[in-house]
């Protein structure tokens, strides 16, 4: 099982060298099963903080279900242990955050319809948050206008589903 801060991805590549100069022997090289390590930070930078129709998330992170930070954008709020516990409780017993709200770094979000045991969504002014639970992690996306809730949901939930399919 990979460590929480690294994920190995096996990639097959084919590299061919070609020159117009006459050669005595073929210089074709084939590389098989090149192993590439993809860090959790790469997932945040390239897959969560990506461009979606000209818009980007305001902040994003991947945290372990214990609240440990695996990777985050520069402006992701400092999440408190009791805030993580509230999120975990809502995944276990959906609806527990609705009366009090969802807190991230002291910011309160009104909980809106999510998917029981899979996704929590919150709204705050012109923005909001989507949290996707995976086998080992919590994937967070925070947005403000002009990004739409649907765009945030798509980015966060697609990465979350990919991680679930990868056993993460």
Swiss-Prot record:
Further information: Plants overexpressing PRF3 exhibit a dwarf phenotype with delayed seed germination, reduced lengths of roots and hypocotyls, and inhibition of hypocotyl cell elongation due to F-actin rearrangement.
PANTHER family registered for this protein in UniProt: PROFILIN, PROFILIN-3
Record family assignment: Belongs to the profilin family.
Pfam family, one: Profilin
Superkingdom of this protein's organism: Eukaryota
An annotated GO cellular component: cytoskeleton
Induction: Induced by hydrogen sulfide. Down-regulated by treatment with the flagellin peptide flg22 elicitor.
Gene3D superfamilies membership: Dynein light chain 2a, cytoplasmic
Loss of function: phenotype: Slight elongation of leaf petioles. Increased length of primary roots in seedlings.
Assembly description: Occurs in many kinds of cells as a complex with monomeric actin in a 1:1 ratio. Binding to the poly-proline motif of formins induces formation of oligomers through the N-terminal hydrophobic residues of PRF3.
Key words, A-Z: Actin-binding, Cytoplasm, Cytoskeleton, Plant defense
Listed Basic residues bias regions: 24-36
GO BP term, pick one: defense response
GO MF annotations in UniProt: actin monomer binding
InterPro entries xref list: PFN, PFN_euk, PFN_sf
Localization annotation: Cytoplasm, Cytoskeleton
Tissue-level expression: Expressed in roots, rosette leaves, cauline leaves, stems and flowers.
Known function: Binds to actin monomers and regulates the organization of the actin cytoskeleton. Can increase the critical concentration (Cc) of actin assembly in vitro. Acts as a downstream effector of the hydrogen sulfide signaling to regulate the assembly and depolymerization of F-actin. At high concentrations, profilin prevents the polymerization of actin, whereas it enhances it at low concentrations. Binding to the poly-proline motif of formin induces oligomerization of PRF3.
Official protein name in the record: Profilin-3
Residue span of region Disordered: 14-36
């Amino acid at each position: 099982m990979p460590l929480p801060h690294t994920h190995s991805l096996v990639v097959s590549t084919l590299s061919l060298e070609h020159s117009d100069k006459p050669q005595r022997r073929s210089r074709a090289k084939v590389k098989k099963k090149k192993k590439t390590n993809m860090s959790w930070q790469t997932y945040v930078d390239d897959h969560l903080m990506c461009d979606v129709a000209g818009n980007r998330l305001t902040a994003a992170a991947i945290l372990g279900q214990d609240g440990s930070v695996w990777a985050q954008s520069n402006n992701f709020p400092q999440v408190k242990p009791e805030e993580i516990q509230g999120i975990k409780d809502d995944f276990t017993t959906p609806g527990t955050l609705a009366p009090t709200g969802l807190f991230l770094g002291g910011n309160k979000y009104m909980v809106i319809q999510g998917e029981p045991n899979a996704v929590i969504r919150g709204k705050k002014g012109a923005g909001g948050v989507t949290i996707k639970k995976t086998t080992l992690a919590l994937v967070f996306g925070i947005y403000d206008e002009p990004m739409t809730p649907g765009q945030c949901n798509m980015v966060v939930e697609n990465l979350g589903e990919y991680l679930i399919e990868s056993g993460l």
